[in-house]
Each structure stands twice: as structure tokens, then as C-alpha cells.
Amino acid sequence: TKGASVLIMDPLDSTVGASIEKYAAAHGAAVIDYDRLTLGGSRKYYVSFNNVKVGNLLGAGLVSCVAAWKVSKPNVLVMYGDPTDNNATLFGQGYKAVLNPLFKAGTYKQVGKAAGTWDPPTALSEFQQQFTAHSTINAVLTPNDENAAPIITYLQRKGVKAKTFPITGQDATLVGLQNILAGYQCGTVYKPIYLEAQAAAALTLYLRAGQVPPASLVNGTTFDPTRQVQVPSVLLRPLWVTAASMAATVIRDRFVTAAQLCGGSLRTACRRARIAG
């Protein structure tokens, strides 16, 4: 109502988000979905990291870790984010593409089934239930660092040693990065948020000017299953970060500082990873 010509929104709820987008479009504003797709929405463009690729990285990271940590018979619990979140659906597509062939071949065994959630206490409860019912579980695909952290703490209290029980993560949180350095998490998917913000800003300038953004910016599409349409998308490349690549990624980008990362018992691990703390 105050003359905005472009609306950028990150919809936590697709039903509410779709209503907002319908209102914006009716008042002449172009809508950009930011980071998360509004299912059933009327946005013109979507800006995010390639979320299927995020899932691919999680799956491949687990596979690499299983080999590096010498887990000879991986019995894997696959965990998911909230099923109402389209990003969680895309992450799942990505890591199932990596893991399902291994399950089918018998190289890996899928054990248990946990309800999807983004709530860490609920994720821990789901893991505990599955771990109690299936004591052979020795690797977990967790979709983000926040869900992984309480599971790692639980396993540590159970006496699980470093580099014996592969666990994955996403978002490059401080705790997640520290768990990686300590040898309790395989790696994390890092999404440089400044690139996402820059892409949204660039797209906004084209829309405000009434111009069609170039293919060098809008480089893909994302399917909206509610409307059965492909949404023109800016899809950015996520990165898999391990202890060996922290210095060249999250530290270089100042996403976290060495001082934040390398306190106490992690000083030796930071020196080993060539992170000056």
C-alpha cells in the first residue's frame, strides 16, 4: 500500500505466504521467493541455493566419512527436516539419490525410520527412539547442524569415540564446525549467505527497471508441486566443508572467526587444520 514495486519474502508458511503474494501481485508488486519456495505462490522468481545439491553433498559427505572412518558395515539412520518445508523435501531428494543405490546394492543398510523435524529436541528424541530400537545404527544422515548437535552430545555421553560414528550437518554453525574439528561430525554444507543476498538484490534491480534478468543470473527452475509449474530460479552452489577446507571457506569469508572456533581443547585441531586461533 506504500508503493513497493518488489517484495522479497522468505515464507515460513506456504499458505500464508501464497496469500501475501496474491495480494502483492494484485497491487502491482513483483515477488521474489527468498531461500524457500512458497508452494502455490505467485512469485516471479526464486532465489536460493541448489537444495537438491545440498542433499547430494550431505549424502556424498556421509559416504566419504564412512570410508575415512573405516565403518565396515554402515547401518544408517536417515533423518529429514520438517515435511512441510519444501527445502527439506529437496534436501531429501538429493541425499536419497546418493544413498538409495547403496541401500539397494546392500553396501549400506538403512535402519529405522524417524519423523522429520527442524526442532533439535524432537530430533534427539526421534534418534533416541530409533537407536534404542535398532542398536546396530552406526551412522546418521542428519540434515542440519542444529539437529546433529544434541545427537552428538547424547552419543558422547554413551561413550562413543571420535571418528567412529559418522554424522552429517548443514549451515556451518559454530557448534557444527567445532564438532567437525573434534571428530564427531563428518562435515557441514556451507551456504555463503552474502551470495544469496547479492543475487536477490541484483534480481530486484532488474525487476524495478522493468527488464528481463539475464540467463547468467536466472540459471535454473524449481518445481512448485502445488501449482504444477516451473519457477524461474537463481540457484547458487553450496559447499561441503570439512576440517581440511574450513580455512579456505568459512574462515576466509569471515562467516566465523578463528577466535570463535578455536578455543580450549580445539586449539590443536585448529593448528592441524591450519586455522590460526
Tell where the protein language model's regions lie, with residue ranges.
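A residue-level marker of the well-folded mature domains of exported/periplasmic proteins
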Residues: T1-G277
